[in-house]
């Protein structure tokens, strides 16, 4: 093998290694950790989808749900830079304000997806006690698991 062929082969090997190492992989995993609320009938204690759901974050102009039908479960975004999020929740014709107190911590999802923030639910407060809320899991992650049950 001549020096010229050797140099060309080395160049091609280096180029292909460079191109293969720089190919970005796609992220196909969920990257948002929402507080997941399943809705239940307060009378029968069975899972029941509300006829109408409206949710607005206190201090946020845009509604999360606006008289939405068929929501089950409800997904509530938490602010990783804060320790409290409050929501005005209207289920059918009953409205109440619920505040969630939590701590946030970074979590590596994968090399492709990077980091997100998971949360641990500490306490909650229902202003008018219009709904009964049961905490089924205080770990708020990207997994598809229920965190709270709202009985209405």
Where are these regions (language model features)?
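Short coil/turn motif common to extracellular beta-sandwich-like domains
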Residues: 29-36
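C-terminal motif of bacterial Sec signal peptides marking the signal peptidase cleavage site
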Residues: 18-21
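Bacterial N-terminal signal peptides that target proteins for export
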Residues: 1-9
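Structural motif
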Residues: 38-47
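Tryptophan-paired
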Residues: 49-94
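Glycine-rich, aromatic-bearing surface loops/beta-hairpins
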Residues: 106-152
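Bacterial signal peptide processing site
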Residues: 23-26
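Short acidic/polar inter-strand loop motif in beta-rich domains
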Residues: 91-109, 117
């Amino acid at each position: 093998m001549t020096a010229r062929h050797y140099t060309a082969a080395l160049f091609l090997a280096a180029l292909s290694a460079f191109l293969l190492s720089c190919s970005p992989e796609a992220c196909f995993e969920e990257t948002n950790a929402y507080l997941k609320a399943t809705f239940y009938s307060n009378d029968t204690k069975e899972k029941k989808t509300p006829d109408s759901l409206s949710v607005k974050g206190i201090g946020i102009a845009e509604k999360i749900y606006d008289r939405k039908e068929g929501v089950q479960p409800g997904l509530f975004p938490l602010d990783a830079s804060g320790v409290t999020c409050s929501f005005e929740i209207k289920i059918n014709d009953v409205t109440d304000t619920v505040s969630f107190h939590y701590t946030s911590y970074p979590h590596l999802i994968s090399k492709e997806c990077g980091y997100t923030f998971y949360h641990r639910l500490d306490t909650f407060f229902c202003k008018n006690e219009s709904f009964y809320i049961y905490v089924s899991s205080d770990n708020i992650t990207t997994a598809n698991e229920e965190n709270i049950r709202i009985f209405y």
